Curated annotation (Swiss-Prot):
The keyword Oxidoreductase applies. The gene is OXNAD1. Residues 47-161 form the FAD-binding FR-type domain. It holds the Pfam family NAD_binding_1. This is Oxidoreductase NAD-binding domain-containing protein 1. InterPro entries: FAD-bd_FR_type, FNR_nucleotide-bd, Oxidoreductase_NAD-binding, OxRdtase_FAD/NAD-bd, Riboflavin_synthase-like_b-brl. Coiled coil: none annotated. Residues 1-14 form the signal peptide. GO terms for molecular function: oxidoreductase activity. Keywords: NAD, Oxidoreductase, Signal. It is an enzyme of class 1 (oxidoreductase). Its EC number is 1.-.-.-. NAD(+) binds at G175, V176, G177, I178, N179, P180. PROSITE patterns: FAD_FR.
Length: 309
């Protein structure tokens, strides 16, 4: 994974025990670990190596799997109960994922909101099947009460302060790239609820989700997304795209589905000086839309993107 975040957004808007103890060390020690692993292997860089210079928290917390389910034919959803009370994250960030007996460390975006962690000490992940050892473990061996460790990292997030200027969000997702954007969407909904109930807090603008997948079976978290659209019809909207649909689209999804890729026109229609764009998906997709936005004179500090391999 490679993360590219505009500097102006970084401030706000934007065996387990053995590994955990090592990663509590200094950043230089962390970089030494990743460099050492590269020297020992000629394989292409993994998550730790790609993100060696990305900001991470110091806390490495034990966590227990308290829920596991199939989110789609190719994606497993995990719910983790996090032990360390000092563990926290911002909407959009990811975790280093340490598994006993698995030497490779995973990197998975959190798809739940920070509020869920605050209230119930839980986070959610959604992991696509792959030959990568951590993903294989999740799909083939992970069960209820499996124990892992997690550490938060990443500079791709939305974390406005109550006094920050109101912003609209356009969230552009491809495939499993929905994960950090769902976290941001859920956080935006929590901010809307807080403002409605207390009459104070951050004033959230509108949120538009543009989400593309192969077919409706691979559109992750459809029900959660549509529930938020229905809860906040004046604030949250979505356009769900499918590129290789072969079966009939169900009546409940039809109003939200477009067959074909997300287009430049859809993006341009939502450009304004109050709008921030968050993009997450395969590298060609993130490159295309970030360049399209720049060519449309959207300020670079209003464009945030994250690439997943």
């Amino acid at each position: 994974m490679v993360v590219v975040i505009p500097r102006l957004l970084r401030g706000s808007l934007g065996a387990i025990c053995t590994q955990a103890a090592l990663l509590r060390s200094t950043p230089s020690a962390f970089r030494y670990l990743t460099r050492s692993s590269v020297m020992k292997s000629k394989r292409r860089p993994d998550h730790l190596e790609r993100t060696a210079d990305v900001v991470r928290q110091e806390v490495v917390s034990a966590a227990k799997v308290c829920g596991v389910a199939s989110e789609s034919p190719s994606v497993k959803r995990l719910c983790l109960l996090v032990a360390d009370k000092d563990f926290s994250f911002k909407a959009g960030q990811w975790v280093d994922f340490f598994i006993p007996g698995v030497s490779v460390v995973g990197g998975f975006s959190i798809c739940s909101s920070p509020r869920l962690l605050e209230q119930e000490r839980m986070i959610e992940l959604a992991v696509k099947h792959a030959n990568h050892p951590p993903a294989l473990w999740i799909h083939n061996q992970c069960t209820l009460d499996s124990e892992v460790a997690v550490r938060v990292g990443g500079e791709f997030f939305f974390d406005p302060k109550p006094t920050d200027a109101s912003r609209n969000l356009v969230l552009i997702a491809g495939g499993v790239g929905i994960n950090p954007l769902l976290s941001i969407l859920r956080h935006a909904a929590d901010l809307l609820r807080e403002r409605a109930s207390k009459g104070q807090g951050y004033e959230m603008g509108t949120v538009r989700l543009l989400y593309s997948a192969k077919d409706t079976s691979e559109l992750l978290f459809k029900k959660n997304i549509l529930d938020l659209v229905n809860e906040f019809p004046e604030k949250i909207a979505c356009s769900l795209h499918v590129t290789k649909q072969t079966t009939q689209i169900t009546a409940d999804l039809r109003p939200y589905i477009t067959e074909g890729r997300i287009t430049q026109k859809e993006i341009r229609d939502h450009i304004s000086k109050e709008t921030l764009f968050y993009i997450c998906g395969p590298p060609p997709m993130t490159d295309f839309f970030s360049k399209e936005l720049e060519s449309s004179r959207v300020p670079r500090e209003h464009i945030c993107f994250e690439k997943w391999w």
